[in-house]
């Protein structure tokens, strides 16, 4: 059984070895909307808002609504996977849809249908990666742990998987078999290697 300790063990996989980095101080920018945590340390959100101020100062917009390269990417939310960097994309080039695992669920089908039918995308790229947290647990264990903590079972599936290559293949089939996705002749799947940065295509 997983329980609260089990869920904690699962969560620890995601944070092990994380580098915290230096904190930025919004006070130096004269911000009046800073929200320190209980220890008095600046929140990450406030640090990122500081970054946004610098970003907005040199921002060139607005860009056209349809993606310039007419492509949609579905990728894992893992922080080590920089989709724009890995594919050489710029802002405005593609729709980038991210979730835990990069799996195809009803919500990804919804987004892809809107992307193609209303915003002109034609190609779809699916990206999983090595050392994924979704390899470290099962759906049953996850639901059991949540139930033991909350007394509730989530209606949604976590979509954990035992092999990232097999799950990419399954994701391709889910996209190409959907009646809601009109363009399925250019649906390709890849596994991103978090150690080398290389994308390996999954075929068959």
Can you describe what each PLM-predicted range is?
Residues 33-35, 40-68, 101-107, 114-119, ...:
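Divalent-metal-activated hydrolytic enzyme cores
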Residues 119-129:
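Ordered, amphipathic secondary-structure segments that act as subunit-interaction surfaces
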């Amino acid at each position: 059984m997983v329980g609260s300790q089990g869920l904690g063990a699962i969560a620890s996989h995601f944070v092990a070895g994380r580098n915290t980095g230096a904190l930025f101080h919004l006070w130096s920018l004269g911000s009046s909307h800073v929200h320190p945590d209980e220890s008095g340390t600046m929140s990450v959100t406030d640090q990122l808002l500081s970054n946004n101020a610098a970003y907005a100062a040199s921002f060139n917009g607005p860009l056209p609504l349809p993606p310039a390269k007419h492509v949609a990417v579905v990728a894992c939310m893992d922080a080590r996977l920089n989709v724009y960097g890995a594919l050489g994309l710029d802002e405005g080039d593609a729709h980038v849809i991210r979730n835990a695992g990069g799996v195809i669920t009803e919500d990804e089908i919804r987004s892809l249908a809107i992307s193609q039918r209303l915003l002109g995308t034609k190609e779809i790229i699916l990206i999983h990666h090595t050392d994924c947290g979704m390899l470290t647990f099962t759906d049953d264990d996850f639901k059991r742990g949540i139930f033991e903590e909350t007394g509730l079972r989530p209606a949604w599936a976590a979509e954990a998987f035992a092999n990232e290559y097999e799950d990419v293949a399954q994701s391709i089939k889910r996209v190409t078999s959907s009646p809601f996705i009109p363009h399925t002749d250019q649906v390709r799947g890849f596994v991103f290697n978090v150690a080398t940065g290389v994308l390996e295509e999954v075929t068959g």
